[in-house]
């Protein structure tokens, strides 16, 4: 969005007429069949362990299309992976069609998760627990954010939960906070409210990683 143009525009005609004078679309519509076809056409380039990864945004927002694509790719013997925030109530329906399931675990405390993200973590925790029991290859990631989930008590909460769900099929990882989405917020004309306090140093990441490894869970860097 070009605010210099759009803020003074009253009719917003470009939205209906696809006029890109001040606003443009940053996506491309594709059919499920086209996605599967492109994957098949490029299969020779996948080499060892290659395939198709669905990420976001949040891929499960388009749940039925995602499910159809995953099923179609599985029928073609093409490996699939999905990165998800774990909030969709029907996520377990996708488990049979996903080769690698990657889920975020931002916080173990329901009230703090609600306060900072706007939604409860109950569905997320439930889906992670189910995935740990039902999916053959689950990778759980903690995006470490200063002032939100990087304290010692919060580390202990993570460790308690991870020990509960650990198994040969489950791996864990800590990721440093980043600002990859900042530009997207600015392009949409939204205020990016995260401050420098959200950044964590490498020592904090190492502290979490060391504690996880010593607790007996399988740590894996991606």
Tell what function each PLM region has.
Residues 5, 28-34, 38:
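FAD-binding FR-type
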């Amino acid at each position: 969005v070009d605010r210099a143009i759009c803020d003074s525009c009253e009719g917003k005609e470009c939205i209906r007429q696809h006029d890109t004078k001040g606003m443009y679309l940053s996506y491309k519509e594709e059919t499920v069949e086209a996605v599967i076809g492109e994957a098949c056409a490029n299969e020779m380039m996948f080499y060892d362990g290659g395939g198709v990864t669905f990420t976001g945004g949040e891929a499960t927002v388009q749940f039925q299309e995602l499910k159809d694509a995953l099923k179609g790719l599985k029928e073609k013997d093409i490996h699939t992976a999905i990165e998800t925030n774990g909030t969709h109530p029907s996520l377990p329906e996708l488990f049979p069609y996903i080769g690698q399931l990657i889920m975020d675990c931002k916080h173990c405390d329901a009230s703090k998760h609600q306060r900072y993200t706007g939604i409860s973590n109950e569905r997320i925790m439930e889906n992670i627990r189910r995935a740990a029991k039902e999916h053959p290859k689950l990778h759980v990631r903690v995006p470490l954010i200063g002032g939100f989930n990087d304290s010692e008590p919060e580390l202990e909460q993570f460790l308690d939960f991870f020990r509960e769900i650990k198994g040969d099929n489950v791996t864990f990882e800590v990721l440093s906070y980043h600002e990859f989405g900042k530009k997207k917020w600015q392009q949409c004309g939204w205020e990016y409210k995260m401050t420098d306090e959200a950044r964590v140093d490498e020592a904090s990441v190492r502290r979490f990683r060391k504690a996880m490894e010593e607790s007996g869970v399988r740590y894996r860097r991606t």
